[in-house]
């Protein structure tokens, strides 16, 4: 079910333009604009991380039954995406968070994250975890998760210690 939410554009020039409506909904990962955004996501991972440290899911993996994939759109235009992977009945993992390069700093990632956390609570998850990069390029993502209350933690699920990865978790139960 789609949800429309008003978001402030932020403190850049967009703030002068007012509010915009974002529709966060389950999405087909085979949509051409989604495929392009996911390819951009994977490309940016390869620019900043060695291959053994890239844990992003490809489109085939995002279609598996244990993964729910959402897009954020404004008037049909893709702004960003994110996915929630079920690790078990009480624990989920955030995957494939990506904002379109044309829509960064507008609150898109925050809106997708809030939507996924609401869904995780609805499912009865007690904890949400994630893996992100340790390099400077991933600082905006880490700040987003820190502001949402995520704490740094040890590797979880199948992950192992990696100097290129940081792990975060949020208790929501």
Feature locations, PLM:
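Intrinsic, low-complexity polybasic segments
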Residues: 3-4
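Acetyl-CoA-dependent GNAT
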Residues: 19-95, 100, 113-114, 119, ...
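Conserved acetyl-CoA-binding loop-helix of GNAT-fold acetyltransferases
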Residues: 99, 105-118, 122, 143-147
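Conserved active-site alpha-helix within GNAT-family acetyltransferase domains
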Residues: 110, 135-154, 161-163
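Short hydrophobic/aromatic beta-strand or adjacent loop that forms the aromatic wall/cage
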Residues: 67, 163-167
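Conserved GNAT acetyl-CoA-binding A-motif
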Residues: 120-133
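Residue-level recognition of the GNAT/N-acetyltransferase active site
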Residues: 100, 133-135
């Amino acid at each position: 079910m789609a949800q429309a939410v008003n978001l402030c554009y932020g403190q850049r020039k967009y703030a002068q333009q007012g509010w915009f409506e974002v529709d966060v909904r389950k999405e087909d990962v085979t949509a051409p604009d989604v495929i392009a955004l996911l390819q951009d996501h994977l490309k940016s991972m390869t620019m900043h991380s060695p291959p053994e440290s890239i844990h992003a899911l490809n489109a085939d993996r995002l279609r598996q039954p244990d993964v729910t994939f959402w897009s954020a759109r404004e008037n049909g235009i893709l702004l960003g995406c994110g996915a929630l992977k079920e690790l078990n009945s009480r624990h989920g993992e955030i995957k494939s968070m990506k904002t379109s390069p044309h829509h960064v700093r507008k609150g898109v990632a925050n809106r997708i994250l809030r939507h996924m956390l609401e869904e995780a609570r609805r499912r009865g998850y007690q904890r949400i975890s994630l893996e992100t990069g340790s390099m400077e390029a991933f600082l905006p993502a880490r700040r987003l998760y820190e502001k949402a209350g995520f704490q740094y933690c040890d590797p979880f699920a199948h992950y192992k210690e990696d100097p290129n990865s940081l792990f975060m978790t949020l208790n929501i139960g």
